[in-house]
Design a protein with these regions (language model features):
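Transmembrane helix segments
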Residues: 59-108
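Short helix-to-coil transition segments within interhelical loops
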Residues: 2-10
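Short cytosolic juxtamembrane segments of multi-pass membrane proteins
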Residues: 140-144
Length: 144
């Protein structure tokens, strides 16, 4: 509630707390993946993975922002928001069609993209993440 009366306002708060760190993280992850990678991914694939990971980090941050009422709840939700990334291991562990039970998790499609290098797997990641961000942003707005 106090955010609305600060000079930044709600949008300024989100920009300062989400957008700036997200842009910095995208650049750093791209640089690190480019120079420290042992997988031999192309620069284009590395760029895409950096962007998708950044989008997933926004989803995780929005979970905390939308539902945490205080610092203790925020710390607990930080643990829960890590479940956004659990989809990354599913296609590597479960190789038959049962893996698609987890297709509602955006990170599942990032792993599918990494395995197959099929650019169509980027779209479900973007649409699912965008939908989650939209829902969580509306929850955040209703909370304030």
């Amino acid at each position: 509630r106090y955010i609305t009366i600060t000079p930044l306002g709600k949008k300024g708060y989100l920009i300062s707390r989400l957008l700036i760190p997200v842009l910095f993280a995208a650049i750093v992850s791209f640089v690190l993946l480019s120079f420290c990678s042992v997988s031999g991914m192309s620069l284009w694939t590395t760029f895409i993975i950096s962007i998708l990971a950044t989008i997933l980090s926004v989803v995780a941050a929005m979970i905390i922002l939308a539902y945490a009422g205080n610092k203790v709840e925020g710390m607990a939700l930080a643990k829960v928001s890590a479940l956004v990334m659990v989809g990354l291991i599913i296609p590597f562990v479960i190789t038959d069609s049962i893996q698609y039970v987890f297709s509602f998790i955006p990170s599942f499609w990032v792993a599918k993209f990494l395995i197959s290098n099929n650019y169509w797997f980027i779209l479900p990641t973007i649409f699912l993440s965008g939908g989650l961000i939209y829902l969580l942003y509306n929850r955040y707005n209703a909370k304030i």
